[in-house]
């Protein structure tokens, strides 16, 4: 695929115009979707199996893992769906996870533990879980010489200057 490629460039948002030789962490992300049985929370909670309980149990297990994984590892998550009303036990809940580490092999190893935690959470809460891998990447391999040369050329031409209108538009987007 890259037989005829001499260099590959990428861009990442930052607060300055520069070319830098910074790497990234290896990363894998997925959306974990828990399904349960909905019921009225006061009228018949015994008939329900809360998908949100599955998400919360999973998150709790992931948080407990943090003490027992390499320090340079990172686990991030956000609940993206957790129910519609407090008086209804949710039959669907979703949580979006990132797992990062400097080495891709370690991400794979830790990811297996995360998947096992999701399965355990589902078993313990009487729910079902499935997940969809959203993305994964290895850490960037940087070229210090090329980055230094590119930064020198960027500074020679002055980088990007935004108009007043572009800055106002960015501020407007930032406010939403």
How would you describe each model-predicted region?
Residues 52-176:
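Metal-dependent amide/peptide-bond hydrolase catalytic core
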Residues 1-90:
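Histidine/acidic-residue-rich, glycine-tolerant segments that coordinate divalent metal ions
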